[in-house]
């Protein structure tokens, strides 16, 4: 399996675990300049994902990172695109309808992606070059990449 896909899977699982830890507490909701909500779960998940993706030396576009000017980004051949908690409004409602989204894009086309649903522990991942996509249900967030691949 592609090493970057493995990194994205592990990052999404660890982020999902942190998201659920926050979900099970009383948490505050802040609002960003665009009036969209922001919670501790968004921040923790973003920090975790960044800790895995930064060492790849591939630029990251994340909803929760400081945005890089388009004049710089337009020259990136490859980048990560991340939404640490896609569905923050649903997270706030605690309805389970939120995901961790991580994609790797080259030449404006996705080459791999991970979607993790922490509330249900459903993991979706794909490698476009291999023309393969997977869905698996995990028992726990602390699943190793070896265990994911064995499912």
Which residues are covered by each model-predicted region?
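N-terminal subdomain of lithium-sensitive/metallo-dependent phosphomonoesterases centered on the IMPase/IPPase/PAP
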Residues: 1-85
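Short, flexible helix/strand-to-coil boundary loops that buttress conserved ligand/catalytic motifs
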Residues: 23, 127, 137
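Short, intrinsically disordered/low-complexity patches at protein termini
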Residues: 43-44, 114-116, 148
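Residue-level detector of flexible, active-site-proximal loop/helix-junction positions
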Residues: 67, 130, 140
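DPxDG-like acidic metal-binding loop motif
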Residues: 73-134
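Secondary-structure transition/turn motif
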Residues: 135-141
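Phosphate/pyrophosphate- and phosphate-bearing ligand-binding catalytic cores of soluble enzymes
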Residues: 141-151
């Amino acid at each position: 399996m592609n090493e970057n896909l493995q990194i994205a899977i592990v990052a999404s699982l660890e982020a999902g675990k942190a998201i659920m830890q926050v979900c099970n507490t009383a948490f505050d909701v802040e609002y960003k300049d665009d009036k969209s909500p922001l919670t501790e779960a968004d921040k923790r998940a973003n920090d975790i994902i960044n800790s895995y993706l930064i060492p790849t030396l591939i630029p990251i576009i994340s909803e929760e990172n400081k945005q890089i000017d388009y004049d710089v980004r337009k020259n990136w051949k490859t980048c990560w695109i991340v939404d640490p908690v896609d569905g923050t409004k649903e997270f706030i409602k605690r309805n389970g309808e939120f995901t961790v989204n991580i994609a790797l894009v080259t030449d404006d086309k996705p080459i791999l992606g991970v979607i993790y649903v922490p509330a249900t522990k459903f993991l979706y991942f794909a490698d476009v070059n291999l023309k393969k996509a997977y869905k698996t249900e995990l028992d726990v967030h602390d699943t190793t990449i070896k265990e994911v691949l064995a499912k």
